[in-house]
Amino acid sequence: MAKKVEAYVKLQVAAGMANPSPPVGPALGQRGVNIMEFCKAFNARTESLEKGLPIPVVITVYSDRSFTFETKTPPASVLLKKAAGIKSGSARPNTAKVGTITDAQIQEIAATKAADMTGADIEAMKRSIAGTARSMGLVVEG
């Protein structure tokens, strides 16, 4: 018989840098999960990614206090900031532009995000990511 799911915990954890401090410790501790076991497994799974890149993770906690987790791709805004070489988006995106991003870069980000964005073709994903870029104050070229 399948194990009974007790909770789903959604977090954003830096790749290769999971440790028992907040937000990981309190979120998993209150569910009775072995925090260090999660940290070691998460760090092992994300060691190939750029260290410090925020990775969304969904942790499924079962009634016997065991767990499984699924990592997602980094948020589009993080990938856009990295591609444009900026630290943060514009506070006034319609008037103050902070950088530019090319269509090729948007294509690359859409391909990266394709695993998480279900039910959309590549053109729809590109439009979505271009919209995110514009809302951050980036100029989309192409």
From Swiss-Prot:
NCBIfam families: L11_bact
SMART domains to which the protein is assigned, alphabetical: RL11
Alphabetically ordered keywords of this record: Methylation, Ribonucleoprotein, Ribosomal protein, RNA-binding, rRNA-binding
InterPro entries xrefs: Ribosomal_uL11 (IPR000911), Ribosomal_uL11_bac-typ (IPR006519), Ribosomal_uL11_C (IPR020783), Ribosomal_uL11_C_sf (IPR036769), Ribosomal_uL11_CS (IPR020785), Ribosomal_uL11_N (IPR020784), Ribosomal_uL11_N_sf (IPR036796)
Domain of life: Bacteria
Gene name linked to the record: rplK
Keyword Cell cycle applies: no
Organism listed in the record: Vibrio cholerae serotype O1 (strain ATCC 39315 / El Tor Inaba N16961)
Name this protein carries in UniProt: Large ribosomal subunit protein uL11
Role played: Forms part of the ribosomal stalk which helps the ribosome interact with GTP-bound translation factors.
Summary of subunit composition and partner proteins: Part of the ribosomal stalk of the 50S ribosomal subunit. Interacts with L10 and the large rRNA to form the base of the stalk. L10 forms an elongated spine to which L12 dimers bind in a sequential fashion forming a multimeric L10(L12)X complex.
Signal peptide start-end: none
PANTHER family assigned: 60S RIBOSOMAL PROTEIN L12, LARGE RIBOSOMAL SUBUNIT PROTEIN UL11M
UniProt modification remark: One or more lysine residues are methylated.
GO BP: translation
Any one GO molecular function term: large ribosomal subunit rRNA binding
CDD domains to which the protein is assigned, alphabetical: Ribosomal_L11
Cellular component aspect of the GO annotation: cytosolic large ribosomal subunit
Protein family: Belongs to the universal ribosomal protein uL11 family.
